[in-house]
Amino acid sequence: MYTNSKQLSIDHTIFAWSNQKGLNPIHVEKAKGVYLYDEKGKKYIDFSSQLMNVNVGHGREEVTEAVRKQMENLSYVCPPFTTDSRGRLGKKLAEITPNNLNKTFFTLGGAESNENAIILARLYSNKHKIITHYRSYHGATIGTITAGGDPRKNEVDSQQVPNCVHVENPYYYRCPWYSSSPEECGERAINNLEKTILYEGPKNIAAILMEGESGSSGCIKYPPLYLKKVDTLCKKYDILLIIDEVMSGFCRTGKWFGYEHHDIKPDIISIAKGITSGYIPLGGIIVSDEIVNTFNDKALPLGLTYSSHSVACAAALAVIDIYEKENLIENTVKIGKYTDELMDKLIEQHPSIGDWRNTGMLGCLELVKNRKTKEPMAPFNADPSEMKIMNKVTAKLRELGMFTYSKWNFIFVAPPLIAKKEEIEEGIEIISKAISIADEFCY
């Protein structure tokens, strides 16, 4: 049965970001806690919470029950109607964000959230340009893939959506300005950002869009005060600050949202992933009162058929309840520190580890061929011929019973926030065995 289902999936569905020929996906029969199980009963530890979204772990009966109850009572009404789950979730989000962010427009996921954040920023400001980082990912719609710096956008549309401007990240490990400290790298990045603002014209710039904490671009840690200074520039030049919390939100970094590490107050926050822990698609933009109030006497031209879906909102309420009752913010801090300790030991054992970057439980190993030269095990935007070593590493991870997200020379470590110390130990032991393959290519 399951073998047939796997083949049906290959024959009749399209796989994202993949060659459609030669696929051999894991066929998942069930999942529980931090583990997946295939059709043969093989267990895989999920070390990236799928795509950094299954924060409360797999198979939570509380979420299933909340969804069941909501569907028995009311499955769907269109966005002009109100529902209990919609109202309660909106109120809860207002409680866990700054006191000037009181209303949420609900979407179905992260890309839609960022797309609508950009649209809203342009509508409110009557300006058109958006500034983002080169090394960033904000979604794969035609607007968000352009806004992000992911080079795969060039295959989608060489023209791209106009008026998106990119700046260098304060990526200290590979600092574009060859800085001698994270602080210096951050200061030079701020200087570069301000010059870009002046070149592009503050009167033309609607918003700066940045992640609360860097995610799939390699968990590039912001230097001290960097995001605070970005916020200062936004206020100086009357530019909105949109913070993308799709991946870093909902306890993933040891706080409700990643931006809380940086003492800033965004104008718009984009959310998705952890809001429902992936159980049902849901996203949103949490918007400042100042922006929302400009539409008190004119129609807001945003809309989605499934916005404020009652079942998705019920799932989100159940997930947020788990975050609070199980103190997952505290657990994330504790397990994140323990992971850092284990990684310090791993670095001593493996010359292929160039850098380890982590905030809470959003971490990434960067593999290199030489620590001194920092030659990557696979380059930025690597083509298939340049991925041979990393493909061997990821194949070994799978063989040893691990699923985790990897990209270029990055291996991500972002397990569900319910993970225990022994599960972290299990996962890191598997990673250690797999990256021994990469060690053989070091010089």
Residue spans of the language-model regions?
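Conserved N-terminal phosphate-binding loop of PLP-dependent enzymes in the Aspartate aminotransferase
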Residues: 1-443
